[in-house]
Amino acid sequence: MKKTVFRLNFLTACISLGIVSQAWAGHTYFGIDYQYYRDFAENKGKFTVGAQNIKVYNKQGQLVGTSMTKAPMIDFSVVSRNGVAALVENQYIVSVAHNVGYTDVDFGAEGNNPDQHRFTYKIVKRNNYKKDNLHPYEDDYHNPRLHKFVTEAAPIDMTSNMNGSTYSDRTKYPERVRIGSGRQFWRNDQDKGDQVAGAYHYLTAGNTHNQRGAGNGYSYLGGDVRKAGEYGPLPIAGSKGDSGSPMFIYDAEKQKWLINGILREGNPFEGKENGFQLVRKSYFDEIFERDLHTSLYTRAGNGVYTISGNDNGQGSITQKSGIPSEIKITLANMSLPLKEKDKVHNPRYDGPNIYSPRLNNGETLYFMDQKQGSLIFASDINQGAGGLYFEGNFTVSPNSNQTWQGAGIHVSENSTVTWKVNGVEHDRLSKIGKGTLHVQAKGENKGSISVGDGKVILEQQADDQGNKQAFSEIGLVSGRGTVQLNDDKQFDTDKFYFGFRGGRLDLNGHSLTFKRIQNTDEGAMIVNHNTTQAANVTITGNESIVLPNGNNINKLDYRKEIAYNGWFGETDKNKHNGRLNLIYKPTTEDRTLLLSGGTNLKGDITQTKGKLFFSGRPTPHAYNHLNKRWSEMEGIPQGEIVWDHDWINRTFKAENFQIKGGSAVVSRNVSSIEGNWTVSNNANATFGVVPNQQNTICTRSDWTGLTTCQKVDLTDTKVINSIPKTQINGSINLTDNATANVKGLAKLNGNVTLTNHSQFTLSNNATQIGNIRLSDNSTATVDNANLNGNVHLTDSAQFSLKNSHFSHQIQGDKGTTVTLENATWTMPSDTTLQNLTLNNSTITLNSAYSASSNNTPRRRSLETETTPTSAEHRFNTLTVNGKLSGQGTFQFTSSLFGYKSDKLKLSNDAEGDYILSVRNTGKEPETLEQLTLVESKDNQPLSDKLKFTLENDHVDAGALRYKLVKNDGEFRLHNPIKEQELHNDLVRAEQAERTLEAKQVEPTAKTQTGEPKVRSRRAARAAFPDTLPDQSLLNALEAKQAELTAETQKSKAKTKKVRSKRAVFSDPLLDQSLFALEAALEVIDAPQQSEKDRLAQEEAEKQRKQKDLISRYSNSALSELSATVNSMLSVQDELDRLFVDQAQSAVWTNIAQDKRRYDSDAFRAYQQQKTNLRQIGVQKALANGRIGAVFSHSRSDNTFDEQVKNHATLTMMSGFAQYQWGDLQFGVNVGTGISASKMAEEQSRKIHRKAINYGVNASYQFRLGQLGIQPYFGVNRYFIERENYQSEEVRVKTPSLAFNRYNAGIRVDYTFTPTDNISVKPYFFVNYVDVSNANVQTTVNLTVLQQPFGRYWQKEVGLKAEILHFQISAFISKSQGSQLGKQQNVGVKLGYRW
């Protein structure tokens, strides 16, 4: 296809005149989000300056590739906003000559934000390239000169090699990008282009195509925008309308981006090929040398120069130092036209070609001095487009009050120019260069300044009338410059602005007051570099919100809401960060200041009224200019792109935040805010936003500069996940009715202090690591939040804990109140409160409670369990001096072994209904006492309005369970059985000692050792004078031991007599006789009961069951043994089916699965779930019988009472032999196996038991045709080895078991034989099993528990089929027995017979 030059005719060229905008397209791929290309062009989104390894995805979310893998993202600020030119020197741009219509350019951000103060740079000379012998390249090229130095951007360097093939070396030049603003097209997968926008509305950018050709002065690039190229995943092609747009290349050796070419030609309708002219550095050097042909330098230094001139463009410089001389110079020539057509060297590029002879006439001057130079203006000087370059230190001053205007001032690095010359009204001074411009003119300077680089020190001097103004307007742009104040009267703060990328305003120890700070982006920065003097910035807000009539009104000056998107405080560690205070002092309460940049202050932030927001900000994205149709296709909103899931996090730091009025809000996407807060005088401070709720969010529009605050629902998960939790690093002090709320996505790392009716709330999953201290009627609430610190209340303060768990200390002095609502509190130590109210809440008096909780399955150890002394052996007391009210739960840890526990001490005003949940160790008490849990703090009986009940109505300790009783106004743990047992132990021991005392022959001195024992036992008995419970409780647990009752008068008399003897005689050597004497003494001392009491005892014994009296530990031990034995019986059940079956299979497999529930008077019900029995058997048929072997493996999951989990396996090998006499069969069997059982969450060894069994069986078969009736019976003897283990300080001893299993039953079947090779046999089977002779005594600690086994019935129906040599059978059975509930199981058996 013919290549087309992107040339515009006269009308279409007039883009800057606004006549017509005809142009063709920039091509992008529709399969990739258009926003990538837009953000790329404006350095927004992911494509910020310096970004690398940027992932690019297609619209299906698939990774297309990674951009900027070998270079940092380029800074496109050097490209003019219309995209047709790029800045290559301070006032020079480069483009193509056929762009004949544009007359000016501007730089900076897109949008209508008036704070940007966008400046228009006029073309004063087009510098069109003329092809001749000295200039051999294509003449469609020019290097226009601008009337002012550009301050918004630093110029980019040009490549110098004119051989295009040089740049195909991707090792040295690994990255290429281009940018343009031609008419926009999307190319779809079929390579069809759709127009989406006209030309010159906005910029798009991406990487270039691959290099396809090159020559002297040009490069040709080609490719397909639908496919990633060598330079990245975002290829973009230009066409008509993109003429002059730049192409940049990265030099890996120099580590910098360079401008390499400008777009001139290509295939405009396909987006396949682009032709670029290489930039011509040598041509630019010619131009620059022509415009700056006067350089002044005094070899000896201290040069003195005087400039004079007139309006006709003629001037002179007189050198008074060294050898006096005069040099003629050219200045702006007011007699020349302001606008005129420039020279055109190629008629194809004819058109307006506007330039300004008047301004271009002014040349640029260069001054250099190695000491201290001096430049004097003898007349008003207008250099037009000429500027001043200074290298070295100079003083520039007028003879009297002369003025200067020109392109600007460049001060080289490490140089200082003292500037004593005022400017001209409506003229802007451009300050560039890294050096310093020290302004010391006198009076009111009516000219303005734009600072793009280096430093400007403002030290304007007052005139005779006291007038002083350094500049009428001051702007900081590009982020490279600094303006330093030498006093606070240098300018009107309403006339100061931070433009594109801003810069530093150094207060230098002085203070300024702003209504609002005009700012464009986060490049704005206010600092104080003074090392000794503090500075203040005061912001008052707009006084009026009534918009006046007139043009050019900045609407931002009449808004209630204002914003500052820059920084307060220095962030560069190489620069001094002096003390700087920020004061927000609005005139009315309805004003709002949004800080969305950041602060790094050595100083305070103070607020007196209004609303002050600290916030992150939405990530800037390029504006969406697409119409509604195209926007909907892209799935993006029209206009400004703000995605709630894509924000920039901010940080704020100050020494103190003084909120003396109004409301301060730390809003979303603040990653951290550091400093101590003092909130007073009815002020409010809010920290954090709350997911899934409405939150007030303030944002500032980058496009318009307007600030809006609105309520936003944060419900989208993607948005919520994008918001960090704000780290609040500092303390909060509240006083004088102040309020603070820390909520949602916020974490306070510091203490909170409240006085004088202040209020603090921690809520919505927020966190505080620090203490809360309340006094003087203050209130603090923790609601659904995490507080990791202590709470201390004094002077009528109130603390509420709601919907939260708290595990630190609360102390409340007189008059204070603590309220818990749907909350839990774990006390770390002893606690004293005044008033306590519970509303459906729980207080855990000891952190060890959670470690020993038996609400849920506990972690058990089969070995000795060692509990940390610091937790288990430390008991806490909660004392409530005032009133306890409400309803809730108190959780205690206890040790009945030592009669120690957490305690609750209450006043007699206490009332309410409460549950006591007590966790005890497995060790049992060994002395006769009672454990008191709740007692009166003042020895007054507790109120009858106070009620306590035990959780689950019991406490497990060792082998037994304990109840709660109220005795003498206190609440104690009580077990009648254990107390009876311990009481009887005391009686027996005391009687034995007294008997032995009577036989003592040793000296009286030896009796001293025995008396303390007797006294202690006597004291224990005296402490429990109450009538002891009936003997049946003890009988049920002590294996029918001899009945024991309370001491009668007869035993007391006998004891008294023994005591008198014991006082004289004592022989410890006779202690060995105690056990022999105990039984006899029990019989001697046991009182005779009346017939009525005896009958009542017997009836009570009949009604009581062991399972109701034993602890969880005991029940689990009995249930575990029961489950193990029942698994063994299940294996034998399957063998019973084999013995009555006439199958002749040589090998078979059997699978059976069931679910069973067991219950008895000895243990509580448990579930044997998911029992899976698998068997493999072989047998050999003999002449009159058969022999065989069966391998069985069973797995089961058991759930014991209180959800204690157990997993068990059983592996057995059995052998059998059967002999047949006619219809009579007789068989024997023998088996051996091993079981393994383990409690859930165990970390120690399993419980292993070995087992052996043998047995005999017999059956007789009656055949009535095809009907068979077979009665049978059998008996098996089992031997199971003993096993001892320990769990939670409970010692379990299981003796060896030896018991018989009896079974008898009958089987009825009927045989069908359809063919010779097929038989089908349905059957019905009834089996009775009895193992009730097995009654084991399991010992838990010292208590002997009964372990009976029962009997059960089995009813089964099944079907057996034989096809050729294969046999298959299936059955369903139901079982029920004395310990076995109604259960059913199924089985399948598959066999083969050779």
Curated annotation (Swiss-Prot):
Q: Which Gene3D superfamilies match?
A: 2.160.20.20, 2.40.10.120
GO BP of this protein = cell adhesion; proteolysis
Q: Does the keyword Glycosyltransferase apply?
A: no
UniProt keywords, alphabetically: Cell adhesion, Cell outer membrane, Hydrolase, Membrane, Periplasm, Protease, Secreted, Serine protease, Signal, Transmembrane, Transmembrane beta strand, Zymogen
Q: Where is the active site?
A: S243
**InterPro entries in the cross-refs:** Autotransporte_beta, Autotransporte_beta_dom_sf, Autotransporter_pectin_lyase_C, Bact_Autotransporter_VF, OM_autotransptr_brl_dom, Pectin_lyase_fold/virulence, Peptidase_S6, Peptidase_S6_dom
What's this protein's name?
Answer: Adhesion and penetration protein autotransporter
State which gene encodes it: hap
